[in-house]
């Protein structure tokens, strides 16, 4: 599928016979795509340009019209995406940044969305939830190998190294005081 998209980018200056019909079809496709799930402007543009019956000029007009109707707003999309990702599964800033970079959003929108999402849900609360869940599922790490796996799991979730180290030390202290 990605090869098809690359091929279509090469002929983006297609000549369209009936511009009005192509604009209408493009608008209908855009509304259907947005009805299925929210998308960024970049994602929608890419999906619309896949079709042979449209070109860049028509897609630009359709996207401008959708922004005018408030169907497309990258800033709001980024904020909603960041907060929903954090609600679904606790993850660190690095993993969230990586997930949002796939959505073809501007760096400014991504940074602002991540900042506001982590103001609402601090990273320390998220890592505590992740640790609690991991302890519930796997139990307390007994061996050095288990501790390393636990640590690596939290790193893969995108949490900062120093934050993980501090929280793991806290978990070890709590375990020692309980015994």
Language-model regions: role of each:
Residues 1-179:
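An alpha-helical, amphipathic repeat domain used for nucleic-acid recognition
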């Amino acid at each position: 599928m990605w090869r098809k998209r690359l091929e279509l980018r090469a002929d983006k200056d297609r000549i369209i016979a009936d511009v009005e019909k192509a604009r209408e079809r493009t608008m209908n496709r855009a509304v259907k795509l947005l009805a299925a799930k929210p998308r960024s402007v970049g994602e929608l543009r890419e999906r619309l340009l896949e079709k042979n019956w449209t070109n860049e000029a028509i897609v630009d007009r359709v996207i401008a019209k959708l922004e005018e109707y408030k169907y497309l707003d990258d800033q709001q999309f980024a904020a909603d995406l960041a907060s929903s990702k954090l609600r679904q599964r606790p993850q660190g800033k690095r993993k969230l940044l990586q997930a949002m970079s796939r959505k073809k959003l501007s760096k400014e929108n991504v940074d602002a969305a991540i900042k506001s999402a982590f103001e609402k849900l601090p990273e320390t609360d998220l890592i505590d939830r992740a640790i609690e869940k991991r302890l519930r599922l796997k139990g307390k790490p007994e061996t050095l190998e288990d501790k390393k796996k636990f640590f690596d799991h939290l790193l893969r979730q995108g949490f900062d190294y120093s934050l993980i180290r501090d929280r793991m030390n806290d978990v070890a202290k709590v375990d020692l005081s309980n015994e």
